[in-house]
Regions:
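Extended, well-folded interaction surfaces typified by the phenylalanyl-tRNA synthetase beta subunit core
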Residues: 1-38
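Short acidic, glycine-rich loop/turn motifs
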Residues: 28, 45, 117-121
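Conserved catalytic motifs of ABC-family nucleotide-binding domains
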Residues: 58
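A carboxyl-terminal module marker
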Residues: 37, 51, 65, 69-220
Length: 220
């Protein structure tokens, strides 16, 4: 690029994944470790006009579910990400039952915990896997991370009767997580407490969940 925005953006990107890893690192620096990031955009495998291609990539770190009172924490694994990927491909009306998972994913993935997704012997639909530990270390990331990439232009879309959905408006406010403790009568159901919290501001409060319960005299 002859006039880059910064010294770190002098070359056209060959993949979206490094940008997602950088975003994840910035989030971890701010104390956010359960992350679901994605981007859809152009990447480049050369300097010619025809070397541009479209990709959709996702990155997942941390626990599969947030803190809650019903089940222990569990770190995201390969099969969780595979489920997300197949769900996305299904929504794109891709021929799921004709896809195959094979070795030889890019080197930024773990060699034994990654795969390329193919349709037939030649058409590459995408990639999936655990990010290599050395890559995570270079970005200063803690814990494991999994990613996937889809190449929409390679998918032979099937017919769909679904109607288009309107894009959600993205808030211009930074996210903020808070833990609160309430002392309530044991007859009050948790749904009533959650509903009361949501009613304070339905636009700004995105999610409310119960992550622990203390009962009896020891709770005071």
């Amino acid at each position: 690029i002859s006039n880059p925005i910064s010294s770190e953006m002098t070359d056209m990107r060959p993949s979206i994944i490094p940008g997602l890893l950088m975003a994840a690192s910035k989030n971890q620096d701010r104390g956010i470790f359960d992350l679901r990031l994605f981007e859809i955009g152009s990447s480049f495998n050369g300097n010619l006009p025809g070397d541009e291609f479209l990709e959709a990539s996702g990155l997942i770190l941390g626990n599969i579910f947030g803190r809650n009172a019903y089940e222990p924490l569990r770190v995201v694994d390969f099969f969780d990400v595979k489920g997300h990927l197949l769900h996305v491909l299904d929504k794109l009306n891709a021929p799921i039952n004709r896809l195959s998972f094979k070795r030889n994913a890019p080197s930024y993935y773990h060699p034994q915990r990654s795969a390329i997704i193919q349709l037939g012997p030649k058409i590459r639909i995408g990639e999936i896997g655990e990010i290599h530990p050395s890559i995570l270390e270079s970005f200063g990331l803690k814990g494991s991370a999994h990613a996937f990439t889809i190449f929409p232009e390679n998918i032979p879309f099937q017919g769909s009767n679904s109607s288009a959905r309107q894009a959600m408006k993205i808030s211009d406010l930074p996210s903020s997580n808070r833990d609160f403790a309430f002392i309530v009568d044991e007859k009050i159901q948790v749904d009533a407490v959650i509903a009361a919290i949501y009613s304070v501001d339905k636009k700004l409060i995105e999610e409310v969940s119960l992550f622990d319960v203390f009962e009896g005299r020891k709770a005071h």
